[in-house]
Amino acid sequence: MTHLLRYKNDSLLISYKTLNNDNPKLNCRIKGLGKFSPKRVILDNYLKTKTTSYIFKTANKGNTIIFYKNASKVRQILFKKKGIKLIKSNLIKNEYFDFKLVLKKIYKLGCRNLLVEAGNDLSKSILKKKLFNQFYLFKSQKNLSKLLTYKEFNGFKYLIHNYKNRTKINTKLGKDLITLYKR
């Protein structure tokens, strides 16, 4: 289901925390549709994206955009040489990007359908502001090890309050429980 969503969207957004912790590929792995992988958009306050990451190594002109607030000139040059589009943007309360402004800038770059694969904090912030049209909640039946550090999703109150239409999706492809919420 994730790869189908990636195929259907022309851009995909994550935070640098997700990128550095998970080292995702953020591509469409459906046979024959790989060329339709979305542009990768990363929110990275201080250009902390690891240069050993898959995203950095596979960046080329036009497929990777990073929003940042501040970084050394050396770091900026390194990223630009890889073909990464850097967009300098201010932070709200010196902590978060203005997501509405990020959306406007992404739109100006020709991106019309944005898939956000975010962790707890970013998802909750966007849900709170009612900026999603649709929200897919994937729930794995696997219990994560207590040895792993992770943040459990705690944005349910915003999800239930702001997104009244709810549909269970049965993909028959895996054991994940998927619920689609719409405004």
Regions found by a protein language model. Give the residues of each.
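Enzymes that bind and transform nitrogen-containing heteroaromatic metabolites
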Residues: M1-R183
